[in-house]
Amino acid sequence: EQKTVLPLLEQLSQETGIPLVATNDAHYLTKEEAEMQQVLLCIQTGKTLDDPTALRFETEEFYLKSTQEMQTLFAAMPEAIANTKRIADRCHVELETGTLHLPAFSMEGVSDNIAFFQALCEKGMQKRYGTPVPEPVRNRLQRETQVIQQMGYVDYFLIVWDYVRYAKQHGIPVGPGRGSGAGSLCAYCMGITEIDPMAYHLLFERFLNPERVSMPDFDIDFCVEGRPAVKEYVIQKYGADRVTEIITFDFFKARGAIRDVGRVLHLPYAFCDQIAKKIDPRQTIAETLAAPDGKALQQLLHTNADAKKLLDLAQKIEGVPRHTSTHAAGVIISAIPLLEMVPLQKNEDTIVTQYPMGDLETLGFLKFDFLGLRNLTIIRNCVRMIQETEPHFSIHHIPITDAAVYQMMANGDTMGVFQFESAGMRHVLLQMQPKCLEDLTAALSLYRPGPRDSIPQYLENRKHPDSISYAHPLLKPILEVTYGCMVYQEQVMEICRSLAGYSYGRADVVRRAMSKKKQEVMEQERQTFLYGLDGVCSGAIQNGVPKAVAESIFDEISRFAAYAFNKSHAVRLCLSGISKNRQNTLWNFYTGLKPETIQSKRLEKRSVRMKEPATHT
């Protein structure tokens, strides 16, 4: 077809005077990837390679050709090649980085945002703590406001404060705080969060500090039915061209790639599934083949042609984006029209960025998390039912020290309570017999891969606190609250600070590196932890910690940091759990879990939830 069309295009160019341009219709990078492209087409369309009706390219020429190849192909039309180069030379894109595209907060009657921010914090501090304000609280607030102003995030706090205020004013339930943002005293005083960071020893530096590389973000929970209204408020305030949701990419992983390629090759599912299960889900196909445990798979590769074909093609598509979706909560609010710097597309009924969050952050765009939480909807429904007989009831009237609530938790009566309803967690609660919020926070943080192995030790230490021994006396004030066990990310930071002299900011950077298991960074940090670093910290040995003890402690925090839980987030989950488990509202609570509310297809699980209140009548 091209051989027929090209002479006609050349003739049309001569007749109209419109210059010719040589183009390269490229769908893949190299000629060798033609088969991979066909496999991807078949996966996308649900076809097999041997299906005569499958969409396919007729040649293997749809790859990105070199300059020499293009010049050879268009040897008879050198002016077309020259025109292509002229266009390319005129294309020049520089994406600015290092500038924060955060809109300036505006509100009628507010002319100085910094002064307004400080006034909100001061007024909120007096409301939360009374007068005179305790000195540690005032000092903490002063430190936080200085960091926030220094790093240029005053408008960020005000923007979040504004849409949280809007939600509360319009009767949309808002969560008490999620993630590291709950560690901010400023956020608590402004009413963004409802968790007192002073009472629960939460660290602001876990959320924001001058040494932090990545941008902070508040994760705010809204009633799932009210979330669209809050987002619409933001769109109306800042402009539809400056507010958008964020794309996410789902990539082919090893096991999924094997199963998908197997379908395309028309191989038996059982055969493909057997091979897929030989791949360690934490590894790539190549890593599994190179590992000692991969010898059986290597042998199959050399003796079975179907297996070789399957794995060869699966490795080619492994790591390739499979499809796109929309970030569950993230929203960009920009100071400039987004199309000036960001390509956009439509995902179903939503406009989203074509850049994922990491690239958006590099370009200076901040993410605001609007999470739709069905549990808040359930709590709202319960409150409305309670108010039919107790008109003045408020969720904020539930004391977090209510012994009856903790007794229910200790009895394992937590069906339908988010994060506490699994059989394993109920078993932990029965063993632990929680008496306070700190107990629930520890239970929630321990019951996850990694720390779960520490549960028996934690329970034993809790029974016999006098028998707990610490590797070094400096660990006692940090780990005493969790009976000698490391439970929270914040404890990792405190250990680095107390033993080795780290700043909180530096300690958070180290925690992040450990959580990502960056071996080179961790080995470098080991030396810093032990021996210190000029201008950074003194090191544990200089602070009087024996070398062997310091090495042992660093090894322990390195292992633990990969699985450690954020205490700020754990406290928020526990407060929500307490709100949902108030003893004298059981019937209302379980009625709030009615099928149309939870939208569950698991009928047998739903019936358990609906029957359980009968045991408390």
Predicted regions: what is each one?
Residues 1-617:
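Alpha-helical scaffold/interaction cores of sigma-54-like transcription cofactors
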